[in-house]
């Protein structure tokens, strides 16, 4: 059966913030028969498939086979991506324009965000019964609400020579034209005559708070806080005269999330011995050092809770971990045809040639000789194409969560990922044949013997 990239694009289109990535992924697993657990409850486990929402932006799913002591296999990815985040108290004005005060999340390529229609997605937290019992609501505008316009070439003749953007000044999106009570004479007159009839006046809540209140359908006074991401509203697409490519926002790292989810669903279907786990971390793009990130204790704590609930001792658990294996999936740099000198001279991954096995002697990518051999064998057994990626010796690449999480859970680990062009652009490019190869690897790793 031909692999359906439209399912990948549909998934990416729904995952417009880390919160929505977890929500969409959780629903996929629940629809596949996984049982949802809570971090706050005591777990009673038996053979079966389970999923845990971790603080809203990280997801942990696992399948317990008939004999759980046989193997521990873990596949990981991350739910976050470079983006523009809205600051608190974000409304600022300039000569009739209403702008949003924002900050950059992760290492995005700034100029690729200019002139793009931007939507907003994330979570809004509302007042609850008391300070500790608040309500969180997911929000996705699903329509463009803001834009960061470029400066015309007539006002910047050197723009094509390269421009460094000031994030605080030149990356602020326009939200709307300023409004005032004078724009609505009836409202203005009524407010002057009877201000008590308008307790939620324009001076009390800014335009952003009122906008969020409209999206959530609540009173502005109920909103306590939010985490909102701006995202390009253009959808991903297959392109090229022969349909060879996929152009889309957020390929880093939703391609990996999609592959890992495919694998853990396959684990449930096949029900082999051992414990098979999938974890989608948050905050990889900003260093992972958070409660829900790969540099925290969340993965070892979750694994321990699984083995505790099954009645195993710490010593038995340590033994299973030492015999286990983890694949960390994050994208790699494919050969760019306009910049071929940027890649290594002998280890050159290209689009549409399969999964890249990422190797770095600095351990910025996790792996050792045995781990590399194991994943090559898995690819061959799964009939999944693979290739080798190593950075140029004089151009350090990025790091990812593989080495970080392996340091917290000492299990043999390898970093893999799909080759991309334009990584961290507002719109990235991948090979249309490659997602199938990653899914094959993950299906075999988590769902195979």
List each language-model region with its residue ranges:
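N-terminal hydrophobic/helix-forming segments and targeting peptides
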Residues: 1-449
């Amino acid at each position: 059966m031909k692999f359906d990239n439209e399912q990948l694009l549909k998934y990416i289109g729904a995952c417009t913030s880390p919160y929505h990535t977890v929500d969409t992924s959780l629903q996929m697993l629940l629809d596949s028969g996984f049982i949802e657990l809570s971090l706050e409850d005591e777990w009673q486990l038996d053979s079966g498939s389970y999923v845990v929402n971790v603080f809203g932006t990280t997801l942990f799913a696992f399948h317990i086979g008939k004999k759980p002591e046989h193997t521990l296999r873990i596949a990981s990815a991350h739910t976050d991506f470079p983006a523009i985040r809205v600051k608190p108290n974000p409304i600022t004005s300039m000569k009739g324009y209403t702008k949003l005060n924002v900050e950059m999340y992760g290492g995005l390529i700034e100029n690729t965000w200019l002139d793009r229609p931007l939507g907003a997605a994330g979570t809004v937290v509302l007042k609850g019964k008391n300070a500790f019992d608040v309500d969180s609501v997911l929000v996705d505008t699903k329509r463009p609400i803001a834009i960061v316009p470029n400066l015309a070439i007539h006002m910047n003749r050197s723009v094509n020579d390269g421009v460094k953007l000031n994030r605080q000044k030149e990356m602020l999106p326009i939200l709307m034209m300023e409004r005032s009570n004078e724009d609505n004479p009836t409202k203005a007159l009524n407010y002057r005559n009877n201000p008590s009839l308008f307790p939620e006046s324009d001076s009390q809540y800014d335009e952003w708070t009122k906008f969020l209140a409209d999206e959530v359908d609540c009173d502005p006074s109920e909103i306590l806080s939010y985490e909102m991401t701006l995202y390009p509203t253009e959808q991903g697409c297959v392109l090229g005269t022969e349909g060879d490519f996929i152009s889309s926002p957020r390929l880093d790292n939703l391609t990996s999330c999609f592959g890992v989810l495919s694998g853990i669903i396959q684990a449930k279907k096949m029900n082999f011995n051992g414990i098979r786990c999938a974890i989608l971390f948050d905050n990889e793009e900003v260093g992972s050092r958070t409660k829900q990130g790969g540099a925290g204790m969340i993965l070892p704590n979750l694994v321990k809770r699984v083995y505790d609930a099954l009645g195993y001792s710490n010593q038995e658990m340590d033994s299973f971990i030492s015999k286990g294996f983890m694949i960390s999936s994050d994208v790699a740099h494919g050969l760019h045809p306009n910049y071929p000198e940027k890649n290594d001279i002998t280890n050159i991954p290209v689009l549409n040639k399969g999964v890249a096995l990422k190797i770095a002697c600095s351990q910025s990518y996790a792996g050792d000789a045995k781990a590399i051999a194991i994943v090559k064998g898995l690819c061959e057994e799964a009939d999944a194409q693979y290739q080798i990626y190593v950075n140029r010796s004089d151009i350090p690449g990025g790091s990812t969560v593989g080495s970080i999480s392996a340091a917290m859970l000492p299990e043999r680990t390898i970093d893999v990922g799909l080759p991309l062009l334009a990584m961290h652009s507002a719109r990235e490019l991948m090979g249309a044949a490659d997602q199938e190869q990653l899914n094959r690897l993950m299906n075999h790793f988590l769902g195979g013997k």
